Curated annotation (Swiss-Prot):
Family of the protein in this entry: Belongs to the UbiC family.
Cellular location(s): Cytoplasm
GO biological process: pyruvate biosynthetic process; ubiquinone biosynthetic process
Gene Ontology molecular-function annotations: chorismate lyase activity
Subunit description: Monomer.
Keyword Transcription: no
Residues that bind substrate: 36, 78, 116, 157
Name of protein: Chorismate pyruvate-lyase
Keyword Cytoplasm listed: yes
Amino acid sequence: MTENALPLLSAIEWLPEPSPLLTASLLDWLLEADSMTRRFEAHCQKVTVNLLREAFISPEEIAAEAALLPPEKQYWLREIELCADGIPWLVARTLVPESTLVGPEQKLRQLGSVPLGRYLFASSSLTRDFIDVGQSAGLWARRSRLRLAGKPLLLTELFLPASPLYGSLAKENT
C-alpha cells in the first residue's frame, strides 16, 4: 500500500472549513495539536519509521505546496512511512526550505529513522500556523505549516487504512 500511497500525497483534495464530512471523531484525529507519533504510541507497542526518500528538490517539484513556503532555490524533502508494530499507519511528506536548515534546525536533515514528531515536539520553539484537512482516494489527510524558532516547514500526512483513525470512525457509525 505504501508505494501506492505516496502519489496520493500529491493528489489530496483540501476541504473548505467547515465541511459536513468532518465528524467529531475525525476532527479529533485530524486536528490533533500534539505529536501524531505520540498519539499512535497510545494505540500500539512500538512506532517505527521507514524512510522512503530524502533529498534536496527544486521548487518545480513542490507544485501547489510552494505557495505555503517561502521561495527558495531548493527544499529538503523527507518522505516516510510511520508504522505501528510493523504495520503502516501513515505516510508523510515533509518539505523544509533550505533557509530553515541553519542552526539547530540542521538536524532536520539527519533524522533518519527518528519520527519527525519526536524531534519537533521536543522543541520549546515549535509553533503551528494551521492544519488543513483533506482526502485522497477515500483516505484522510492533514497538512500543517509548522515553525521552529520562527522558521517554516510543511508536513503532509496521509492516514492509511490500518490507522486507528478509521477504527474510531467505525465505532462512531455503530
